[in-house]
Design a protein with these regions (language model features):
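Hydrophobic/aromatic beta-strand patches that form the interior of the parallel beta-sheet core
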Residues: 32-34, 71, 97, 128-132, ...
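Glycine/threonine-rich flexible loop motifs
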Residues: 104-113
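Short acidic, Gly/Ser-rich segments with clustered Asp/Glu that frequently serve as metal-coordination loops
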Residues: 11-19, 209-210
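Short acidic, glycine-rich surface-loop motifs adjacent to enzyme active sites
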Residues: 95-103
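Electrostatically charged, flexible surface regions
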Residues: 43, 147-274
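Glycine-rich phosphate/pyrophosphate-binding loops
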Residues: 123-144
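A cross-family phosphate/adenosyl-ligand binding-site feature
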Residues: 1-5, 16-87, 91-92
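Alpha-helix C-terminal capping segments
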Residues: 84-90, 117-128
């Protein structure tokens, strides 16, 4: 039986990046394309609620010259993935491919990334995941600008082939791949670590405002090159222009010798004798 590949994203069913992801693996297995009904950028691993959450609609999507069934789900990417696995898949998928996202997911941005979170949600159900993103200007996140997807398809396909053939190590949940805007299929690919820098930084727009009025914060990709880790995802894609692949795990435990100190546990407050 051919592998079953779940293809999802956070940009919505009609994103060119989702189509590029599906095309990159279309001959590697059977496709199950399930994505949010609307743009869901920066929702992280939110299980949103609402009267219409979980509503599913079938669509026909042209992928590599053939018509493939695709499904939109009202809700966040993790809601879409959960419904895909619980009620749309006819068997457990062999791989979840999340992307290809408009906008790189590196450094502190992983904490809010739906592209990464969708792949992690699949892994929570036992399905290995790849999160793939391509570097674009922040202004392009929601506009679906025309892009050359050839390099992104190339590297996404290569990683998918490897995961389908070899699986992932037991301590790896997801591969987080980021492709530079000017990459070609010959661009170097590098294993990296997640940078501790936040990368996307918010600021207030200029001018005055009425506090009760809505306000959209400005956001910009920001790098402190002098403090950037040598083997980090940000350095790879932003400074060196190479493809970054970071193996991610579920653990958020810091490797430190920190211990709670007894002198702070006794604050002089009365304690129960019961």
């Amino acid at each position: 039986m051919r592998p079953l590949i779940l293809v999802t994203n956070d940009d919505g069913l009609h994103s060119p990046g989702l189509l590029a992801a599906a095309e990159s693996v279309s001959d590697l297995g059977d496709l199950l394309i399930v994505a949010p009904a609307t743009q869901q950028t920066s929702m992280s691993r939110a299980f949103v609620t609402g009267d219409d959450i979980g509503a599913i609609e079938r669509h026909d999507l042209r992928v590599a010259g053939r018509t493939v069934a695709a499904y939109s789900v009202v809700g966040s990417p993790v809601v879409a993935v959960t419904h895909a696995l619980l009620e749309l898949a006819d068997r457990p998928p062999d791989l979840c491919l999340s992307g290809i996202n408009y906008g790189e997911n590196v450094g502190g941005a992983l904490g809010v990334s739906c592209t990464v979170s969708a792949a992690l949600e699949a892994e929570a159900h036992g399905v290995p995941g790849i999160a793939a993103s391509v570097q674009v200007d922040v202004a392009s996140w929601r506009k679906f600008d025309d892009l050359d997807w050839s390099a992104a398809r190339h590297f996404t396909r290569a990683l998918a082939r490897q995961v389908l053939a070899d699986g992932l190590p037991s301590d790896v949940a997801v591969l987080n791949a980021n492709i530079p805007r000017d990459a070609t299929p010959n661009t170097e690919i590098r294993r990296t670590v997640q940078s501790r820098q936040p990368y996307y930084v918010h600021s207030l727009p200029e001018g005055t405002r009425v506090p009760t009025d809505p306000l959209r914060l400005r956001i910009a990709a920001t790098v402190d090159a002098d403090q950037l880790e040598a083997n980090s995802d940000i350095r790879a894609i932003v400074c060196d222009g190479v493809v970054s692949v970071t193996p991610l795990s579920w653990s958020m435990t810091a490797h430190t010798d920190w211990q709670p100190r007894a002198e702070y546990l006794d604050d002089g407050a009365p304690r129960s004798t019961r």
